[in-house]
């Protein structure tokens, strides 16, 4: 493995974004300001009161964006009164220009929690997945243009202050979720109850209207569940502007993720959208969707194997064509959440730690060239002035993979005064724990680390200064 700090190859991309934000109760003052509601300040509160928020842990991870899809499944976010268009604007026959016809209360509260975590909301316009026997919010709207006008006013509420709203920084607005799910297998779709042709018409109308209203915002979608046949067919006939194409991939290897990313990028370039961002905004470790392999996958997501998959995928995606990763899911209470326990709320799980580890690189900003020929070895590095960092992971989906020693050559950062390297270890028994430090001299030096499968290291590097 090799890191060349002389060679800056771009910016570190937001690979540590999530679906959904922190669980936090927000107190809003009469002047509109708001802060976390601290249950510990309540007079006569029981001394053993369970922590009921993960705001601090969420903020410490430095999560840059939170997509709000499926937020309405969780009562702490507001449940059936939150985020989804049909929950905010409940009477589709009402006047979409009248603020009284909108119920923003719970969604306001949820978004404030994200703002308190310094996390920008990536807003999914549409509805949560409906696995129920009867579908409601995933049916095609009665009037496509009116639906777009409703969304226009939701955007104005959160970015322009309409209807006693806000001027939050919310750049990404996504139209719908997984319209391709069961699109050609004869099953009833839990995400789009119409035809492919209807969705194409719907998307064209909605995206064109919203981009006309908000040329400065990023309008895109449609959060494709992963069908490349559907993706090509959709992009080949798309008429509307497309600032980003969002898609999903659940897989057991980084290769599967990167192969799909390459196909998406190829279709975008081929069909006239070379500037559109490719955003993978649902992903997690999944070996299969049925049987014992599915159960195994769910078990691993919050364990060290799931954590290593997260770290490896972040590093691989940084080197590839993906512009943003959004892990599914940080929503408490779902079995997809490998980051946070539900009780106590602030307890973090193994898959949490790659997020603050990657954030160390993200804060440095400048991605530098890395080379790896080590099977199962993943590496990503960044620098800014006299500071640098390296994220290193050993991930192989085969649980029987033997431990290795990884040798890393680091070029272009140190000098005769020395570079101090701090080591932080994530494995079965360490949670991004400080594991020692060493000083290395010269413009080029090597580090060798023992790397059992599913191990990650964060190396924080600083130039030593003469007194």
Predicted regions and their residues:
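Noncatalytic carbohydrate-binding groove/subsite architecture in carbohydrate-active enzymes
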Residues: 195-310, 320-322
């Amino acid at each position: 493995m090799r890191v060349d700090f002389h060679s800056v190859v771009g910016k570190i991309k937001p690979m540590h974004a999530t679906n959904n934000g922190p669980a936090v109760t927000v107190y809003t003052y009469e002047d509109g300001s708001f802060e976390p509601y601290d249950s510990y300040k309540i007079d006569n509160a029981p001394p053993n009161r369970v922590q009921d928020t993960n705001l601090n842990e969420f903020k410490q991870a430095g999560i840059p964006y939170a997509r709000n899809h499926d937020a309405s499944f969780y009562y702490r976010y507001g449940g059936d009164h939150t985020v989804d268009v049909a929950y905010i604007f409940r009477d589709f026959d009402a006047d979409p220009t009248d603020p009284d016809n909108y119920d923003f209360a719970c969604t306001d509260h949820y978004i404030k929690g994200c703002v308190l975590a310094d996390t920008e909301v990536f807003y999914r316009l549409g509805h949560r997945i409906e696995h129920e026997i009867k579908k409601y919010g995933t049916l095609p709207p009665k009037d496509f243009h009116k639906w777009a006008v409703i969304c226009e006013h939701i955007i104005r509420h959160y970015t322009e202050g309409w209807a006693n709203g806000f001027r939050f920084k919310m750049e990404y607005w996504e139209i719908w979720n997984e319209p391709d799910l069961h699109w050609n297998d004869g099953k009833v779709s839990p995400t789009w109850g119409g035809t492919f042709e209807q969705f194409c018409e719907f998307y064209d109308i909605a995206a064109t209207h919203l981009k006309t209203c908000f040329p400065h915002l990023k309008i895109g979608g449609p959060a494709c569940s992963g069908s490349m046949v559907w993706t090509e067919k959709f992009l080949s006939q798309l008429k509307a502007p497309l600032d980003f194409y969002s898609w999903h991939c659940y897989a057991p290897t980084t290769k599967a993720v990167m192969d799909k990313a390459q196909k998406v990028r190829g279709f975008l370039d081929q069909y006239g959208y070379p500037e559109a961002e490719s955003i993978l905004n649902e992903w997690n470790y999944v070996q299969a969707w049925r049987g014992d392999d599915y159960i195994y996958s769910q078990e691993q997501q919050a364990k060290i194997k799931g954590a290593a998959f997260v770290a490896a995928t972040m590093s691989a995606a940084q080197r590839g064509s993906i512009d943003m990763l959004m892990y599914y899911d940080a929503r408490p209470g779902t079995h997809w959440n490998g980051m946070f326990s539900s009780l106590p709320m602030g307890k973090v799980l193994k898959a949490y730690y790659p997020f603050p580890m990657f954030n160390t690189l993200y804060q440095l900003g400048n991605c530098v060239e890395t080379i790896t020929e080590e099977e199962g070895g993943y590496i990503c590095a960044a620098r800014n002035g006299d500071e640098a960092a390296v994220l290193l992971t050993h991930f192989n989906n085969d649980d029987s993979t033997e431990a290795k020693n990884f040798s890393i050559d680091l070029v272009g950062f140190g000098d005769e005064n020395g570079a101090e390297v701090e080591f932080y270890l994530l494995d079965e028994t360490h949670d991004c724990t400080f594991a020692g430090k060493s000083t290395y001299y010269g413009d080029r030096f090597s580090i060798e680390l023992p790397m059992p499968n599913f191990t990650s290291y964060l190396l924080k590097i600083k130039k030593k200064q003469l007194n």
